[in-house]
């Protein structure tokens, strides 16, 4: 995978450089993942649908033979932070709202298809270092593209089912988002060291979370 995105190209051959703003980079990771997911689906003869903004999930996968057995895929990302001693702090991800489709009686709020049609929910998660040289967006000529720096480095990722990495507390800040486990070891996410043993256990907890 070529992670070295450095900007957005216009028809007039100008490059708008990328800042390390987390909202921008979350969209970038989704863009990078989409062709890979699409290729997998084409090879398996699966259908792939994208959700709209603020709708769960980002990608819905299913077979025409079993349209009521859908797979949800969401892309999540965060950046590394270190303490004064240079040690990596624990990190976490937000895993979508618990007040929409999970707590909706019909399971149809804020979701592409009714929640009951999804048999699996997967997270592709990324963690990266922010490039301090990419704090702001600038405009450069296309001839300078090879000298531009990407806004991130040291990218690592995991792929895991949501219930296996979900925690028991909401995401940070004034949100209604499910919070993941917290760890400074990405292998805890890769191996799914969350507190829930089954998807049903996870759903029961968050359907009743206040």
Language-model features: where?
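Anionic group-transfer/hydrolysis microenvironments
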Residues: 60, 76
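Nucleic-acid endonuclease domains
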Residues: 1-55, 65-68, 77-210
């Amino acid at each position: 995978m070529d992670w070295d995105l450095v900007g957005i190209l216009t028809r007039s051959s100008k490059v708008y450089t990328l800042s390390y703003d987390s909202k921008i980079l979350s969209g970038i990771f989704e863009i990078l993942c989409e062709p890979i997911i699409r290729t997998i689906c084409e090879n398996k003869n699966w259908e792939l649908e994208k959700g709209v903004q603020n709708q769960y999930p980002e990608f819905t996968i299913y077979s025409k033979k079993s349209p009521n057995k859908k797979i949800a895929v969401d892309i999540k990302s965060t950046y590394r932070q270190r303490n004064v001693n240079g040690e990596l702090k624990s990190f976490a991800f937000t895993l979508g709202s618990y007040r929409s489709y999970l707590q909706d009686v019909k399971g149809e709020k804020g979701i592409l298809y009714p929640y009951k049609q999804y048999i699996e929910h997967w997270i592709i998660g990324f963690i990266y270092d922010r490039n301090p040289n990419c704090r702001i967006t600038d405009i450069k000529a296309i001839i300078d593209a090879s000298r531009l720096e990407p806004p991130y480095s040291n990218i690592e990722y995991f792929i895991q089912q949501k219930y296996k990495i979900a925690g028991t507390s909401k995401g940070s800040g004034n949100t209604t988002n499910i919070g993941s486990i917290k760890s400074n070891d990405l292998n805890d996410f890769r191996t799914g060291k969350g507190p829930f043993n089954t998807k049903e256990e996870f759903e029961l907890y968050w359907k009743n979370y206040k």
